[in-house]
Each structure stands twice: as structure tokens, then as C-alpha cells.
Amino acid sequence: MRNTLFGILFLFILPLQAHQKLPYLQKQGSTTQLMVDGKPFLVIGGELGNSSASSIEDIERIFPKLQRMGLNTVLVPAYWDLTEPQEGKFDFTLTDKVIQQARANDLKVVFLWFGAWKNSMSCYAPIWFKEDYKKYPRAYTKAGKPLEIASSFSENVFQADSRAFSQWMKHIASVDKEEGTVIMIQIENEIGMLEDARDYSKEADKLFYAPVPSLFIGYLQKNKRSLHPEMLAKWESQGFKKKGTWQEVFGADVYTDEIFMAWSYAQYVERMAKLARSIYNIPLYVNAAMNSRGRKPGEYPSAGPLAHLIDVWHYAAPNIDFLAPDLYDKGFVDWVAKYKLHNNPLFIPEIRLE
């Protein structure tokens, strides 16, 4: 009987231990800590260049250098075009090599999914995706020009991106669940619209001139006192309307276009995040190119996870753990203050070394 009881307890304890090994975020007073192997983990990290993990040779050459630099974490791109070079056929060779080299050099890994968007553009999407622009439509400018930016309003775009992402996440879970080398995932990279503040495709226009979702209006009403000042001012400018189109609720300008586009991007990312959590529940984040140097939406990547759009992103993408700023401009202290919030832990993936 005692042996039987021990066996039953052992069966229950094993899944619990495996679960406890997964990284997670934990609130400690006013601070949020990244927990790895059940202990607070301070990331001393560096991010590889855009194509620095695109060959086995480069990975093997770079990773030992990172250890010698004193890093404990490396942020590494994972490329959709190299993961799914042929539609439906997946190659995880580079992912496996990253994990193997990280373990060999005592490093943790934060993977960056270069999927439908990288720095706004769809440059790391597979060639079969790029060539079939009818099935996988592009975003359009106001003047009617198609961009090399996949449309976030296309279900086909989402299905293709999310299928590859899901297969990749399943692979990571299968090869790394016991070791716990991979500690976070960034979904897409510096998502945002360029040239114009929003997509002007027919699908986008249809939703832009439709009513603002009532649930989002309800969120604004419930959180009126804590809204970002810019979001509050936009809503107030139209008399705090409780229903109407995007322009009727927020006004007819480029910043309303940006709010609308942020809603679309955040919903897309939320669907990706839900898939990720259902497969391998580790911390997830998105990064943002800054709205700096007096530029307007579209001059900077419009509608990304920016501080003034935090209400849109937090509501529409609740499965994202934090919005992360990429800091290449002067005014470090001011930028950090925009993102170091009670509801947004500060993590800076990219920064210019002055």
C-alpha cells in the first residue's frame, strides 16, 4: 500500500515540477520579476543582428563570444522564411542549433518571431507567401498603392503566420520543456504601419467606418480615470461618446487612424499569443519602434505597442505580458518613464550604445 501511494504521489508531483520549471512573471511589491527555475532572474542580455542567426556557422561562431562577454541571455531572431521555406514543410534546424549552442555556453534564449512583420515590413515572410499577393493581401496607402506590408485584416495572412508560429512553438515545447533554455518569446518585431497611419484596403475601410466595438467603449468608460492622457484627450474631444464610428468617437485625424490600426494589430497579436499560451506558457511580449523626433503616425511605425496606445494594446491583447520600447533616441530617462508603469514591466530589447 505504501509503495502504491508513493507511486501515485510521484505521478502527481512530476507534472507539477515540470510546470514549475517554466519561466513566468511574478509581482513582488511594486516590482515584477522574471522567474526562471523558480528563482528571480536578472537578464544580462544582448540581441543578435537581424540575420546573425540565419546560418549554423554564424550561430556556432557568435555564441561562445557572448559567454565571454559575460552575458547570461541572448535575444535571437527566428525567421518564418527559413522555418517554412515551402508551404506546410517546416525546418527547425536553426532553432535547434540556437538552443544547443545556448546550453553549451550557459545562456538563456529569448526568441524573436520574425513572422508577418519585421520593422513594419513583411521582409521575413516566405517567398511563397510574398508571391501569392491575392491570397495574402498587402496593406494599401490612402493613394491606393500596395505596400510590402501584409494586411492585418486578412484572415489568410493570420492563418499562414499563426500556423508556422504554432508549429515552431510546439517544437520548442517538445525539445526544451525539461531544460528551460527558452525563457521568453517576442511576437513579431516592431509591428506598425508606414507611409500612412492605417491600412486603406477595402477590408480595413469597411471596419474603419463601422462602429467602434462596444466592449472597447465599455473599457474606456470603466477606466476613464487611468487612461493615458492622449487617449483621454482624443475621446474627450468628441464629448466622450459612447457609440459611433472611429472618427465619430475619436475625431477625424491621423491619430484616430492610428488608434484604429492599433486595435487591428493588437487583436492579431492577441490571437497569436493565445495560441502560444495553449502550447507553451512562457512570458510573451511585443516591441515598439518609438514615435520620436516629432514624426507623425506613418512617418514612424504607426499603431505599434507605443505608450500613448497602451490602453488599446492592454485591452485588445491581454495575453501579452508587456510592451517593450526599442530606444535609439536621446532622452533615455523620459522614454523609460513612459513604459515603466504599474501595469507594464520595463524590458528594453534594443538600445543604442552611447
Could you tell me what each predicted segment is?
Residues 9-18:
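Hydrophobic h-region of N-terminal signal peptides that target proteins for export
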Residues 18-72:
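N-terminal carbohydrate-binding accessory modules
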Residues 38, 74, 102, 168, ...:
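Conserved, mostly hydrophobic/aromatic
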Residues 45-54, 77-95, 142-163, 171, ...:
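The substrate-binding groove and active-site-proximal loops of carbohydrate-active enzymes
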Residues 52-68, 301-316, 331-335:
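Short, acidic/polar
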Residues 58-133, 262-279:
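Aromatic-lined substrate-binding rim segments of carbohydrate-active enzymes
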Residues 107, 269-282, 308-354:
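Catalytic-core region of carbohydrate-active enzymes that cleave or remodel glycosidic bonds
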Residues 135-310:
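Polysaccharide-binding and catalytic clefts of secreted carbohydrate-active enzymes
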